[in-house]
């Protein structure tokens, strides 16, 4: 396509050999300490050298970290923008860069992008993964000036992106909506053009397109990904107690499988309280199988396709209105029924309903209990919902971006 990417990143990841990849240590003392620990661990392991060097560096940097916190109060990542800006400025001035593309999660990438745009005038494209402004409740539009200095700076940075980026996009309708409310200059002349891009996902490894599902003696409900107290399987275990009281046979037939992350404390407590150690099975992270040679990702895909129903936990924080779990895009490729427990996100609900999914409202115990009962009854009849197969690939994201950035 005639595009030669030059990648800037932190030093903590693996260096990409396909194209120029510059890895920078952050210059601030707190971020330097963080990056240094990961760099030493990757290079020498976590043995004697790691312990000696990291403790020494921590002691030497301690007073400077305290000064940084008192003077600025930002999260440590901010200082990564300094080397990224300097290197980027040099590449731009020597004619090696035509467009800056800032991608974050980490807001320091956007900060470096804005600096480069303002100093050089280069075209800036920004992709915002997570909300920069965290709202507290449905009535909070995000106008209030945060007391926390890091949050206050992120508020300012969002306004900078909406003003100086040539194009800026978010991953959900909700995220774009609230950004536009706070930044009415968005999509106006001499400001950024903002829109929504659904990231999608490539088909998972070892995906079997015509997988014929086999019903077994157990109803297997499977969750993949991270868990936390605000995104917990305990809500399903609570519903299971009610289901077992109504259908005692369900106690021996239902199994809940958790892959990829440790259990959260609420789930652990619910297991102990209800004696569900044989019901909820924590498999942890699936790694490469030395016997079959299958990668961890391939094994995960197989487990997804073997599931009777895939569990999608959305969370309970207000920012769920601006967030769609990336795991959904992997789920959609498997062709298995999804049970989504969602929170204040009409776009996500519509996506699930269009594909014939089970749907519950986070925090609504009766809604969750009703969905679990329906799944149980459907499984007994071997009539689980047959999803409408509409996976979302990355090709549509590319088409969407091109439709916005190319001259009309």
Residue ranges and their predicted role:
Residues 3, 32-34, 180, 195-218:
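Acidic anion/phosphate-binding donor-loop and adjacent secondary structure
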Residues 7-79:
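A conserved catalytic-core segment of Leloir-type glycosyltransferases
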Residues 75, 82-90, 108-111, 115-119, ...:
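Membrane-proximal helix-turn-helix segments that form the acceptor-binding/catalytic region
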Residues 152-193, 349:
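A short, active-site helix/loop in glycosyltransferases that binds the activated sugar's phosphate group
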Residues 169, 204, 213-231, 237, ...:
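Conserved donor-binding/catalytic core segment of Leloir-type glycosyltransferases
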Residues 231, 287-305, 310-329, 339-350:
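Nucleotide-sugar-dependent
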Residues 247, 253, 257-261, 265-301:
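Nucleotide-activated donor-binding/catalytic signature segment of Leloir-type glycosyltransferases, i.e.
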